[in-house]
Amino acid sequence: MFDGIGFMELLLIGVLGLVVLGPERLPVAVRSITGWIRAMKRMANSVKDELEQELKIEQLHADLKKAESQGLKNLSPELQDSIDQLKEAAQSVNRPYKVEDIATGSEPASSEAKPAETTTAKASNSTEKSDG
């Protein structure tokens, strides 16, 4: 973590912090500084991950264009792997929408069945009352 800082430099920073901030405010300052460092590391890692993902997508698009220019029959194994990854990604994007369509399509059918059941139950109760 402290690549360019030796033990003596850390000791000097600690003593200066103790003199400037005092023993009561130094722990609070250290905690807030470590929180900032953690937040900056998280932000840098998220940016790095997003860039890697974008570069991977760009590489897949370049491979796909190269495959289209060569024709989809005589492909190298790397290009075929890229095409397979793109197909899997496209299928995974389409799947959540299919699940939602099925879920929304089945809910109205089940809600229509419930009033019909209650209607038949009321009808059977009214016939029993008229008989009795």
Curated annotation (Swiss-Prot):
PANTHER family: SEC-INDEPENDENT PROTEIN TRANSLOCASE PROTEIN TATA, CHLOROPLASTIC. It comes from Shewanella loihica (strain ATCC BAA-1088 / PV-4). Residues 90-132 are annotated as: Disordered. GO terms for molecular function: protein transmembrane transporter activity. Part of the twin-arginine translocation (Tat) system that transports large folded proteins containing a characteristic twin-arginine motif in their signal peptide across membranes. Together with TatC, TatB is part of a receptor directly interacting with Tat signal peptides. TatB may form an oligomeric binding site that transiently accommodates folded Tat precursor proteins before their translocation. Keywords: Cell inner membrane, Cell membrane, Membrane, Protein transport, Translocation, Transmembrane, Transmembrane helix, Transport. Residues 109-124 have a biased composition (Low complexity). Coiled coil: none annotated. It is found in: Cell inner membrane. The Tat system comprises two distinct complexes: a TatABC complex, containing multiple copies of TatA, TatB and TatC subunits, and a separate TatA complex, containing only TatA subunits. Substrates initially bind to the TatABC complex, which probably triggers association of the separate TatA complex to form the active translocon. InterPro entries: TatA/B/E, TatB. The chain crosses the membrane at residues 2-22. Belongs to the TatB family. Signal peptide: none annotated. This is Sec-independent protein translocase protein TatB. One of its GO terms (biological process) is protein transport by the Tat complex. NCBIfam families: tatB (TIGR01410). The lineage of its organism: Bacteria, Pseudomonadati, Pseudomonadota, Gammaproteobacteria, Alteromonadales. Pfam families: TatA_B_E (PF02416). It is a single-pass membrane protein. It comes from the Bacteria. Its main location: membrane. GO terms for cellular component: TAT protein transport complex.
